[in-house]
Swiss-Prot record:
Residues 400-482 are annotated as: Thiamine pyrophosphate binding. This is Probable pyruvate decarboxylase C186.09. It is an enzyme of class 4 (lyase). One of its GO terms (biological process) is aromatic amino acid family catabolic process to alcohol via Ehrlich pathway. SUPFAM superfamilies: DHS-like NAD/FAD-binding domain, Thiamin diphosphate-binding fold (THDP-binding). GO terms for cellular component: cytosol; nucleus. Mg(2+) binds at residues 450, 477, 479. Keywords: Decarboxylase, Lyase, Magnesium, Metal-binding, Thiamine pyrophosphate. PROSITE patterns: TPP_ENZYMES (PS00187). It holds the Pfam family TPP_enzyme_M. It catalyses: a 2-oxocarboxylate + H(+) = an aldehyde + CO2. Its cofactor is a metal cation; thiamine diphosphate. Its EC number is 4.1.1.1.
Length: 572
């Protein structure tokens, strides 16, 4: 924000809506995603008065929440505004995803007039009861802070608290604003530092954790580093790279941390994902006697159905606010601070690098298929690899797109986005939309399956509306392939669509979206060429492949996850 005080002065006299707008801008929000509804219309008017905020309309509340989630990936924080119950209930899905993925999204919901609280009135958009607190109570379960403004005098304190918690905890928060409250006067905002003051480490515990950890690491034969998904949200990527350079050991990354460490780095050892690992990463982790796990989270998905977990005895675990080493835990130690300080005390040890060079595959290049042969996944990956550059951000949706994305080698500064913890199919389309608004200079490319696309296709219309040149590769194999591999059944077959035609239908005579259907390598290459030239709107390339064409990694992963899901109850 150019001048926080200027933004405050622009809002005189201050109302609650104006106050919220100023605080959003001070927190770093430049765009807010909205679906209008009668309980939030007055608030939307107030937000529009702020010159530092731009309103972005969404097609529905699920997409609105996911668009804000994607914006938070690019911008560091996001906000979305919906109406009561019929809007917020739908948005809760995406907010749950933001919580799972450590993304600070501020969910703002209008709500009934305060005069109706405690009255005998039954209102629309409610459950048909006289208790209107249920949405606030629900929001508390999926946010790190939830506030409901019932008295204008409380608004500044409650708004500040919620936004500050979002920034500190990197989790979503909820702010409920009754329809008659947004225009009520309140105190003017104070300094931005009241909400943006960063958290700091406990210096005593930090030093103790670093000293003990350095002694242990320096006494080991083959230390390695493992990058986890929390590095990005908690701004620890640079500190992690600093430690990697100081220790000079092999570095593997979890699948949901791809691009958080440069793949061009000489010590990069690939993706650690059990039998779905790349470049021999599983071996280098399993052979290590000291694994520094930085910002890692192990779930059934990221551990390949619990089949790939680092040996606990060899793990030094660095979480976002604590370090666990040799059965000792040091709280109040921030991830970034610990990595930065540890880098000063470790000794270089390239034993794991020397060992890794002996097992690293010589080449990952995929041979070119006959241009006229039926299209397959390998040829799609080969051609997308040539499309990716340092300005690219690659989104991979839940499904076989994950495994295809892992095979893409990222040049330095390229980014990779995945939603592995929440795992909502269709997430990538609205999230990429929000990301493109937050990072307009990035080239956004999406891998999405046909079943996933059917969940959230409406947001393509907003890409058309805002002339966003997002390129989407829709892998059409006529079904939910990821679920087929976990547990097959007739419910995994879906109705085929003419996806290319649907995308162009969103133009309605005035947009610039393009849709292509391709069935071989030659057609795919031509579609990519035209997609690169289309700078005024989205391009969807429908890649038709055989229904049985899926990666062997997905088959293995699906088997392991299915086995974990099907484990019988413990005997009493």
């Amino acid at each position: 924000m150019k001048d926080n005080q200027q933004a405050v002065q622009l809002q005189q006299p201050t109302t609650i809506g104006h106050y919220l707008a100023v605080r959003l801008a001070q927190a770093g929000v430049k765009h807010h995603f909205v679906v209008p509804g009668d309980y939030n219309l007055g608030l939307l008017d107030k937000l529009q008065y702020n010159n530092y905020l731009e309103e972005v309309n969404c097609a529905n509340e699920l997409n609105c929440a996911f668009a804000a989630e994607g914006y938070a990936r690019a911008n560091g924080i996001a906000a979305c505004v919906v109406t009561y119950s019929v809007g917020a209930f739908t948005a809760f899905d995406g907010i749950g995803g933001a919580y799972a993925e450590d993304l600070p999204v501020i969910l703002i919901s209008g709500s009934p007039n305060t005069n109706d609280i405690g009255s005998s009135h039954l209102l629309h958009h409610t459950l048909g009861t006289h208790d209107f607190s249920y949405q606030y109570e629900m929001a508390k379960k999926i946010t790190c802070a939830a506030v409901s403004i019932q008295r204008p005098t409380e608004a500044p304190r409650l708004i500040d608290y919620a936004i500050k918690m979002a920034l500190l905890k990197k989790k979503p928060v909820y702010i409920e604003v009754p329809t008659n409250v947004a225009s009520q006067p309140c105190a003017a905002p104070g300094p931005a530092s009241l909400i943006t003051e960063p958290e700091t480490s406990n210096q005593e515990y930090l030093q103790m954790a670093v000293d003990i950890s350095a002694k242990i690491v320096n006494g080991k034969q083959k230390p390695v580093l493992l990058a986890g998904p929390k590095l990005r949200s908690f701004k620890a990527e640079s500190a992690f790279l600093e430690l990697a350079n100081s220790l000079n050991c092999s570095v593997a990354v979890m699948p949901n941390a791809k691009s958080f460490f440069p793949e061009s780095h000489p010590n990069y050892a690939g993706i650690y994902w059990g039998q779905a690992s790349t470049l021999g990463a599983e071996s280098i982790i399993n052979w290590s006697d000291c694994i520094i796990c930085a910002g890692t989270t192990f779930t059934d998905y990221s551990s390949n159905g619990w089949t790939s977990l680092p040996p606990k005895a060899n793990v030094l675990h660095v979480d976002v606010d604590r370090v666990t080493v040799s059965d000792a835990e040091f709280g109040g130690v921030l991830l970034r601070d610990f990595l930065h300080e540890l880098a000063k005390k470790v000794k270089a040890n390239n034993a794991s690098v020397v060992e890794y060079k002996r097992i690293r595959p010589e080449s990952l290049e995929i041979p070119m298929e006959n241009p006229k042969a039926a299209l397959n996944r390998k040829e799609i990956i080969r051609q997308v690899q040539n499309l990716v550059n340092q300005e690219t951000t690659l989104f991979v949706d839940t499904g076989d797109s994950w495994f295809g994305g892992m095979r893409i080698t990222l040049p330095e500064k390229a980014r990779f986005e995945i939603e592995m913890q929440w795992g909502h199919i269709g997430w990538s389309v609205p999230s990429a939309f929000g990301y493109a608004i937050g990072a307009p200079k990035r080239n956004v490319v999406v891998f999405v399956g046909d079943g996933s696309f059917q969940e959230t296709v409406q947001e393509v219309s907003q890409m058309v509306r805002l002339n966003l040149p997002i390129i989407m590769f829709l892998i059409n194999n006529r079904g939910y392939t990821i679920e087929v591999e976990i547990h097959d059944g007739p419910y995994n077959r879906i109705k085929n669509w003419d996806y290319a035609a649907i995308v162009e239908a969103f133009n309605a005579g005035e947009g610039h979206a393009k849709g292509f259907r391709v069935g071989n390598g030659h057609e795919l290459a031509e579609a990519i060429r035209q997609a690169k030239e289309n700078s005024q709107g989205p391009t969807l390339i429908e890649c038709n492949i055989d229904q049985d064409d899926c990666s062997k990694e997905l088959i293995n992963w699906g088997h392991n996850v299915g086995a974990a899901n099907g484990k019988p109850p413990a005997k009493e």
